[in-house]
Amino acid sequence: HMRLVDATRGIVKAEDLARMKPSALLVNTSRAPLIEPNALVEALRAGRPGMAAVDVYEKEPLRDVSEPLLTMDNVVCTPHLGYVSRDEYEIQFTDIFDQILAYAAGTPANVVNPDVMSRRR
């Protein structure tokens, strides 16, 4: 998994996909915008990579049944829950709870922009 931030948006380019083997399988259960817009559909149509499994889409929630990825024989699509397991939920919610407790205690963890902490009211 890769987080979606400005530096990772579109990090996978069409030329990266074109270098994949026809036998390659691209799996994206992270964030669709990590891949350059429309690049995956075009690459799959060109046969490089030959297959994809996706759990995330450029437009979510996905309501358009004519979405190209949904109509392709070489793509497996799941409804943005492909990563979900009981263990994953327990890990995720334990971490969230621990972070809330740390924040309430005045010792927040994983602060991406620590300068805002000096502006706390």
Where are these regions (language model features)?
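Rossmann-like NAD(P)-binding element
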Residues: H1-I11, N28
